[in-house]
Each structure stands twice: as C-alpha cells, then as structure tokens.
Amino acid sequence: PTKSMEVPGGSSITVTATALKGSNVTASLGGTKVKLKQQSNFVQDENGTKLDENSDFAVYSGKISIPASTSKVQSLGRIKVYASFNGLSATMSGASVSVSAVIPTPEPTPTQPDTTEHPSTDKPSDTTDGGTGGNVDFNPSKMLTPYAYAGVAGRSKMCEITSLCETMPANVVDDCVPYSSPLPAGTFDYISSEYTYGGSKYYRLASGRNILASKTKLIAQGYNLPQNKVSVVSSSSNSDATTIKFGFTWKVPFNVAVKNQSYIPSSQASGGSLYAVTAFNGKYVDITFSHSGNVVGKINVSGSKIVSAAQWITDSKAKTLTLRLTLRTPGRFYGYSVGYTSDGCLTLKIKAKPASSLSGSVIMIDAGHGGNDSGAICAYNPNSSKKYEKQINLLLAQKIKAKLEARGATVIMTRSNDTYVSLDARANMGRTKNPDMFIAVHCDSSESASPMGTTAYYYQAYSFPLASAVHKRIVSAYKSSIYSGAGSATLNKIDRGTNMYPFRVTRIEECPAVLIEYGFVSNIRECKLLWSDSVQERLAQATVDGIADYIASN
C-alpha cells in the first residue's frame, strides 16, 4: 500500500512489491521485519490480468502483523521495502501506518434465562427433533434496537448495516476470506474501533469482524442492548432446501461457515492463497450468533436431504451461540441463503442437490464485461469491428446457453447483448435468481504476448468441484482437438490450474460459482483460435460436458 492508513490493532497488512526475479526482498514497519515471497501466476486485478511471465521481474508478497490497539492512536511510521540482487540493492517507502484506538464497548446484560429449554455450556447439545420443529412464539414488533432504551444502562457507539455487507475477520485489514460471511441489512453491532485503508473507512465490530463504514448507518450514542436470545420459530425440509427460521431479542451479527475443510499450504497454492483446496471435504455448516447466550425451540432435520443432525454449541467466554448442521454426506454442499424475510425472521435455507442431470438444472451464465467495459484488447482482430474480449465472452456464453438448453437445462444470462452490467449487479443476480450454479465466461490477458492456456477460479471451497470438472474438460478439448498435433512446448502450457481467487462474482454463497478464463487474447495465435466459430463450439461443448460431469459426481 502507498496511501496513509489507520488500521485496527491485532490485524495484518499485506505488502506487495515488484522486484527482479530471485531477489531477496524484505519489508519493515514499526520495528517488525518480514521476508516477502516471490509469487507465481499472480493476478493483478478483478479482470484477471496477469504479469508478463517472461519479464525479469516478479511480484513479492508478505504480511506484517500490527500491534494491539490501546486507548490512543499509535504511529508506526512508513512501510519500507528493501530488495537486493547480485550486489544491487534498492529501498522504497510505502504507506504511513498508524494503529487505531480502542472504543470501549459494553458487556451485554443477560436476558432473563429461560429454564425450560437451553443448550449445555459444556458440550454440543443435539436438538434434532421430530415434527415440524420450532413452534416458538415470536413477535418481531418486540425486537429491540439501539434507537430506544432497552432496560440496559449506558450508551455506546454502534452501527446498523444498511445493505448486504461483506465482512473480514478482525485480523484482516483489506481482504475477504471465505469463512467470513456477509451481514444482511438491519443487523446491529457495537463499534470497537475504526480505520482507513485505500481511502475507505472501515469499522471493527465487537463481534470480531471488519466492515466498510459506507455500508452502515452510524449510531453515535446507541442504547446498550441485552444479551440476545435465539428463538427457533420453525424448521422444515423439502426437495429444494432445509429451511430454519430464527427470531431474536435484537438483530445480532452472525456468521455462516463450512467447517472441517482441508486447505493446502499457501506455499503450494497459486498466488500464495491461504484458502486453496484440492477437494471439497467439509463436514459441517456452523451458524454463529454473536452477543447471544440462550436458545429456545427445537430444530427438525429428519426429512432433510442435505443435513443429518443439528446441534447447539455455546461459548460463554465469547458470548456466542453456534448452530452446527452436520452434512448428510461430507463433501456434498450446494450453497445457502440467509436474510430477514417479511415475517421479521432471519431465514436460513440450506440448498439440497438441485437435480441429478442437466435436465432440470438452473444455470446462470455470466458473459464477462460488456458495454463501455470492453475487457482486454484482442491481439488478433478478424475485422475492424471485432477486437475486444467482451465480444468473445458473449459469443461463447451464447453457445454454452444453446447447448445447455438443448439438454434440458434452464439458463439465466447476466447479459444477452453488448450492455454494461456492474460486478455487484452480476453477483446480486447470482444471489437472488436462485441458480443451481454460476459460471462466469472470460478470456485472459497479459502484459506479454507469450502466455497462453486456460484457468478456472473458485472462491468458496464447495465451488472447487465445479471449477475442476469444467477445467478438465476444457483442457482436454484444447489438447485433443484445438491444439491437436502441437508439440509438448505448447501442450504443457495449456493447463494453468484450478485456482482460488476472490473475484467479485465468485464471492457468493448461494450456489457454486466459478470463473473460467478460456484463453489469452493477448496471445495472437490463441486469440485467433478464440475468434474461430468452430473453436468456440468445442469450448462451449467442453463447458457443458464439465457441468454434466460435476452434476453426476456430486
């Protein structure tokens, strides 16, 4: 980073620098020094632009830990980066960094305990039950807010989420992670501290996460609220989903995360990702409610196709309640939706397996870029009117759509012509249109003309199986037909892997979501192939076959 920033204590800052390949690169801040690691296949931006692989330079990256916050702002000075190579050395300065001060937050006052039914504080309690589940009286009009006195002494700095807001763990300053889920509009929380990064203001919440301040309404003197009680209003299952409705004393923050998932070491992952996988093997879905200590009502999952058991876990020290839903089959998960519905309940839907074949599946195809967002410029142009990545993306997407529909699938397009659709709007379609899967169609680009090949990207671990299945088919199509007869020097460059990266359109929870880079438009030979109608047909067929493989094996 280069802009001045004020960051929360206990977090970390990612420092990146460009230096000659093979250099020794370190970064220092406030007496802390770290070694930066050279990164491979580094993605520069949301467009997936790659660095020139043949360049003498590479990107180096590492994290600097920030000391704990105190009652006053602490100045750490400027980030300094040192690089040395074969007797040459250079030093550069980056952002000026300070540590934000702590804002005192109150201890929630417990509500009157409900002695008729609540979880054990020592171990998980099984709340699976027959019948409809829930059946607890809940009146949303009686929910408390920080805008009115709630019987608890004192007032605090608080905020209300005003629109769906992505979150980051408290120790992360500027990056999203798959185990930190978004918060819906209407959620309240105490503000522990605030900081600025990249010109944007962030709040660190008492629940242990960081959010963009622009997604909230500040309540400078909010009335303190009591400890929350969770009421299970209802639970049911059908062929589409397992649905659980919750009522609250007040709209507390919560987090949804797939647990017991294995990740590969960052040193083995493309770009050094901390959350890359080689398979999806998650066993549980944990829904953790902050500022909470009591629950009433039972959950019925007896008819669920996706969940086999439900347990409540309490953590009295952290003041959280966690509902653990055990997956009926480990490694089989198809997404979830959660938000407040018109009845005032927080409604969680765990999606069941949508269909057993392409026929009956609902698939969203996202043709990347469009309108005034042209994407990358093509190195080869069939004629003066065909020269942008956005055009190839749409042609490919239309062919994929036709082939899917021919096999009985329903296809939703984020765009069907040359129009601009924002990244947020595309992601929102994936959240609200209820597709079974989301596939973004893109072409790659580099600062150099030499890189070639195809890459698949995922964000959530449960999106990896779809990304991998489609990628394998596309690689096979290139090797067996599109580049048929090519030498090993070409064939060995085709498979660029199935990689984790937080593209905006893959950061959705409602279904498996992937982004496919079909080839490099910056490579003249490959760009010419990507403009070929017959090659587009083969790539579209490979995509459809990959989707079918995913459905059959998952």
Q: Where in the sequence are the language-model features?
A:
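Solvent-exposed, polar/charged alpha-helical surfaces in well-ordered, non-transmembrane soluble domains
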Residues: 390-406, 428, 432, 464, ...
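Active-site-adjacent mobile loop/cap segments within catalytic or ligand-binding domains
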Residues: 377, 438-447, 457, 492-554
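Short linear recognition/processing motifs and adjacent strand/loop elements at protein termini
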Residues: 1-11, 16-18, 22-26, 30, ...
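Active-site-adjacent substrate-binding region
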Residues: 465-499
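Active-site histidine-acidic residue metal-binding/catalytic motifs
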Residues: 343-429, 433-435, 452
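Soluble non-cytosolic domains of exported or imported proteins
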Residues: 173, 177, 183, 387-395, ...
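A short, glycine/acidic-enriched catalytic loop
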Residues: 373-388, 445-472
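Solvent-exposed loop/turn segments at secondary-structure junctions
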Residues: 369-372, 416-421, 443-448, 461-464, ...
